[in-house]
Amino acid sequence: MEMLTAICGCVMAVQSLIAVSVADDAYAREARAFLANRDKTVQPRQIAEIRKAARGETNDLAAVRSARNVMAALPEGVTAEWVTPKMRLYRLQGKDKLPLLVYLHGGGWVIGSIASCSAFCGAVAKEGVAVLALDYPLAPEHPYPAALDAVCSAYREIVTHPSRFGCDPNRVTIGGDSSGGNLALTAALALQQEGLKPAALLPYYPVTEARVDGTISWREFDTGFGMDGAFMEACNAAYLQGRDWADPLISPMCATDDELRKLPSVHILGADHDVLRDQGKAFADRLKSLGCRVRYELPRGTTHLYITVPGQPSVFRRAVQFAVEACLQSDRKN
């Protein structure tokens, strides 16, 4: 009997490894196709306009931003309500007191909008988690701390008036991709100064240090992998505008050990071929070393943008599943 149990255990382990291998192959194959088909002129134009805007020449930045402002169609059974002109609430029809994900789009704090994350928000809502997308103010017109202040203000509004958002105030997760993931982490650090604590945090390939970090992933994937290092560098400059990158409310990796220990559970899904890969992994490793509740996954072969730009459907589906897992497991007492 013991031998049979051991054999069954080995078979299950092999099946799990095969499933992971198949998923990794799909992730890598789709990422290669995504990069091969991507318009190579988009990012250089974005970088040039962001740098100009940081110098005060903002006339052409609107055109760059508009490219990521197309709202996705809603999945069947999902409604989307403009709670305010800056907040869009996604949820299943007729459902109330749901766990809520406050979602913050990526785009280097400079581009992106509620529309750019709309497909993701709708997909998560389809699975029974309400999602509130926040259109936070963008740099360089509104540099740090404008976006952070908007996120914290939205969180206070949600937990103070949960019926307005149809949610359980004890199960409010804050998440986002790239710079949005940064805002999720920094908002939690800022809110803890007020005695407020989200149920969980859900950053996807987050910025944890707003600087050129010199890591292996930054050097290896600096150009041609979805988000160039030069793009991130231009966005950092537009957002900081001379402020100290090492401020923990800009770079959460710079928070003290005590501050990090007070965070709720953190669920990080990275991107493999990405300049931000290593800083995200380092942040997760630090949380683990401090005894924090952290879940970290790195889907092999993936690249930046899988949340907001179509083309990597397998990891997009995993990202949706990852969000649902985080939100349904969330508990304010964590």
Describe these PLM feature segments.
Residues 20-334:
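Alpha/beta-hydrolase superfamily serine-hydrolase fold, recognizing
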